[in-house]
Regions:
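Cationic, low-complexity basic patches in intrinsically disordered or flexible, solvent-exposed regions
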Residues: 4-6, 20
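Gly/Gly-Pro- and Ser/Thr-rich, intrinsically disordered tail segments characteristic of DNA damage-repair
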Residues: 13-301
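Gram-positive cell-envelope targeting signals
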Residues: 1-3, 14
């Protein structure tokens, strides 16, 4: 489903969930709903690592067509390679330059300033300064990634009805968990962990999750807050938000582009009006008609 259509379907989604809930003998009020957003970690890169029998969390790998120019965009960068400051959608020449920079620093720590080998494994590199950093370049296989995505979707179907799973992209879904927590006797976090662990055990791919009292909070919990949560032994990060914790944690968070659906252009227009944070936006939305900061200012953006 195109991302811009997700918000349009919220009311339809709610109505379907209520109907499904009645069939199952329960009804979850709209104010008490719980949503889980799940994002498969560096999905394309993880698939390529798994297919090579490698650990997706410790293998340095990029998904890119190396036969094109070095300006080609990497479709994915593995987590261990991101640790060197390489963004998820870097161009190939940026990866090459960063690896050169890292190896220059590593060479200074190598015995005699000479490398005695190379490795694309983060654990081996951490254990031995004698090795130079290298990485695997995997040619994109989009049809294969779609097959993996379908397999993972079918795993989710073991736990929830299709009416309650909403595919956001090839590697990301929203799940309305409201009617299932009581049935399974689990908290929202435990339920998320249960599904993610099943995906990991079945495919070797881990994930990050956000839990919220609405779609937006689940998404933001996953995109922003989970990044600051310690990962478990499987690399899983899960964060939760409700309306109050959102205000407490993210009211003053910057940059605004970290938030769902706020791009650089919109951020720039907001900043031109003296609006820099979500707290500023909220205060503007309740401003009175005679004040400079009021909701009309936001509507004109």
């Amino acid at each position: 489903m195109p991302k811009y259509e997700l918000e349009k379907r919220t009311n339809v989604w709610y109505n379907k969930n209520i109907q499904f809930g009645r069939k199952k003998g329960y009804k979850v009020e709209r104010d008490n709903r719980i949503y889980i957003a799940i994002d498969l970690k560096s999905f394309y890169a993880s698939v390529e690592c798994v297919e090579r029998g490698l650990d997706p969390l410790t293998t340095n790998l990029v998904v890119a067509d190396a036969e094109r120019t070095q300006k080609t965009i990497c479709l994915a960068v593995s987590p261990s390679l991101k640790e060197y400051g390489i963004p998820g959608r870097a161009r190939l020449f940026e990866v090459i330059e960063k690896v050169k920079e890292v190896n220059c620093a590593r060479r200074m720590r190598a015995p005699g300033g000479i490398f005695q080998g190379e490795s694309s494994d983060a654990l081996e590199l951490s254990a031995s300064p004698k090795l130079s950093l290298t990485y695997i370049t995997a040619t994109p296989r989009m049809a294969y990634y779609m097959e993996y995505s379908t397999r993972i979707y079918n795993i989710y179907l073991k736990y929830v009805a299709p009416e309650d799973i909403h595919v956001y992209s090839v590697d990301e879904v929203f799940i309305d968990a409201s009617g299932y927590l009581k049935t399974y006797g689990l908290t929202a976090k435990e339920f998320a962990v249960k599904m993610i662990k099943d995906v990991l055990d079945t495919t070797g791919i881990t994930a990050t999750a956000g839990i919220g009292t609405n779609l937006y909070l689940a998404k933001v919990a996953m995109d922003i807050v989970a990044k600051h949560v310690d990962a478990d032994e499987d690399g899983v990060r899960i964060a939760e938000l409700d309306e109050m914790s959102y205000r407490r944690i993210l009211w003053n968070h910057t940059p605004l582009t970290d938030f769902w659906r706020i791009g650089r252009g919109y951020e720039h227009r907001l900043m031109e009006c003296g609006i820099y944070t979500m707290g500023d936006i909220a205060r503007c939305s309740v401003g009175k008609d005679g004040e400079y900061y009021n909701e009309e200012l936001l509507y004109k953006m």
